[in-house]
């Protein structure tokens, strides 16, 4: 594939099935993909899929060579999770470049988003929002299990989601495995889209040092304190060794995205320092990781920047 997913002559057209929980950000994703040059079709009846794919863009048309993103979910007429999975596998067997992108979000956050926007859940017209969320999660389970890529938007704002999509599907996205190193706070829950997760709570904690507590793991003094733990050098070496062993295997197996999550109690000191240190080592080894500190800077106000990537979509 060339930049932004544009297809070279003779290559199969890339097809991305965009699906997931209502309110998790699918509509935001489709809009972002369209802005990046993708052709997008939302809420396509599954029965019309073959007809759409058979109608290849005419030579010289605006859609020629553009990758295709299809929004399919529980709102779709004749929707069937297992049926969609079968169709995707059939496309692959026929030589098509087809994959599934699934957007997820915690039930609590989905409920909050619907409450905040006062939107109705598509599967809870005459029931509680929580009932609709639970029912939809059950319906979508086969798609989630078969997904090639999972994006959890529980802690993501609209802007953060758009930035993530630009990194993964935009002009700067290349071939190979896209690598993300994320720090997080166990107190705020583990990231559900992590492929590898490491717990830094065995290291001594700068939180209990008054002059270090106000600063983050980005501070050199905080980093020096953490690195001064007697177990730190060996633990770091072993963790890096394991990751460097596994990453080439992930790429060999065709995994497009790998997220390494580094956690500590508050997501401010140990996990932040170790994530930065790990990313630096990975760059030395020829990788190009993106670093994200999930809980280091929380949104000041939902009113300043929406944390609802796509309620009702």
UniProtKB/Swiss-Prot annotation:
<comment type="similarity">
    <text>Belongs to the RapZ-like family.</text>
</comment>
<keyword id="KW-0067">ATP-binding</keyword>
<dbReference type="GO" id="GO:0005524">
    <property type="term" value="F:ATP binding"/>
</dbReference>
<dbReference type="InterPro" id="IPR053930">
    <property type="entry name" value="RapZ-like_N"/>
</dbReference>
<feature type="compositionally biased region" description="Basic and acidic residues">
    <location>
        <begin position="292"/>
        <end position="303"/>
    </location>
</feature>
<feature type="binding site">
    <location>
        <begin position="73"/>
        <end position="76"/>
    </location>
    <ligand>
        <name>GTP</name>
    </ligand>
</feature>
<keyword id="KW-0342">GTP-binding</keyword>
<feature type="binding site">
    <location>
        <begin position="20"/>
        <end position="27"/>
    </location>
    <ligand>
        <name>ATP</name>
    </ligand>
</feature>
<dbReference type="InterPro" id="IPR027417">
    <property type="entry name" value="P-loop_NTPase"/>
</dbReference>
<dbReference type="InterPro" id="IPR005337">
    <property type="entry name" value="RapZ-like"/>
</dbReference>
<dbReference type="Pfam" id="PF03668">
    <property type="entry name" value="RapZ-like_N"/>
</dbReference>
<keyword id="KW-0547">Nucleotide-binding</keyword>
<dbReference type="InterPro" id="IPR053931">
    <property type="entry name" value="RapZ_C"/>
</dbReference>
<protein>
    <recommendedName>
        <fullName>Nucleotide-binding protein Swit_0399</fullName>
    </recommendedName>
</protein>
<dbReference type="GO" id="GO:0005525">
    <property type="term" value="F:GTP binding"/>
</dbReference>
<dbReference type="Pfam" id="PF22740">
    <property type="entry name" value="PapZ_C"/>
</dbReference>
<feature type="region of interest" description="Disordered">
    <location>
        <begin position="289"/>
        <end position="313"/>
    </location>
</feature>
<comment type="function">
    <text>Displays ATPase and GTPase activities.</text>
</comment>
